């Protein structure tokens, strides 16, 4: 069972639907016991960084997320879910992130000919043998919707990058914690394969 953390953000049902498509059972929940008893946990979301942190704290889900990560349970952050795992964001200055991973969320720089938010398909450059990308081609195309991007403090945790106005850390992996700026649930067959790879973690070890 995969728990999808419900903190009032959008996009929860599309993640649930994608997991169903690959044959995985999931539950959308904010209940601590259901989350801690799940085999794996996903933190999805679209919206504003500060509002999301307020919601996580309101439901005490910030504490639950730290518990999950400390348990070495596989954890996946998607889009805003990636951003929340880091220290803070230009979008909501003065608001502390979850500090699960080290790095900052920065605004995508303005560049002539490019629209912000970045909405659409971009290819990834894979690196560091990320487990989410096992069996994928070298430059898979995935779907992005964002105005802010990750600059991780440690390049060793970065498993995929892309270019849009600047160099973007698009996916990271550290121990049991995985995160991607793009939306695997909206990324067609490549995205479903990424979710399959996440679902298989621990089953084949």
Where are these regions (language model features)?
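Acyltransferase
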Residues: 180-205
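An anion/phosphate-binding loop that grips the pyrophosphate of nucleotide cofactors and donors
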Residues: 38
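Beta-strand-turn-beta hairpins that frame and shape the catalytic cleft
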Residues: 139, 173-178
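Short, surface-exposed beta-strand/loop micro-motifs that present aromatic residues
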Residues: 167-173
């Amino acid at each position: 069972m995969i728990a999808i953390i419900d903190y009032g953000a959008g996009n929860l049902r599309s993640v649930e639907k994608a997991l169903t498509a690959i044959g995985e059972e999931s539950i959308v929940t904010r209940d601590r016991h259901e989350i801690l008893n799940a085999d794996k946990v996903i933190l999805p979301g679209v919206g504003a960084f500060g509002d999301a942190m307020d919601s996580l704290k309101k439901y005490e889900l910030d504490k639950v997320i730290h518990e999950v990560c400390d348990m070495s349970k596989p954890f996946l952050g998607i889009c805003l879910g990636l951003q929340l795992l880091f220290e803070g964001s230009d979008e909501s200055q003065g608001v502390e992130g979850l500090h699960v991973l080290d790095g900052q969320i920065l605004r995508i720089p303005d560049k002539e000919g490019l629209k912000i938010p970045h909405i659409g398909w971009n290819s990834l450059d894979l690196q560091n043998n990320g487990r989410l990308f096992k069996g994928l081609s070298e430059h898979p195309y995935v779907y992005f919707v964002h105005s802010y991007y990750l600059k991780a403090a440690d390049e060793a945790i970065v498993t995929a990058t892309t270019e849009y106005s600047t160099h973007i850390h698009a996916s990271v992996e550290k121990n049991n914690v995985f995160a991607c700026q793009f939306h695997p649930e909206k990324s067609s067959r490549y995205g479903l394969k990424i979710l399959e790879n996440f679902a298989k973690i621990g089953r084949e070890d």
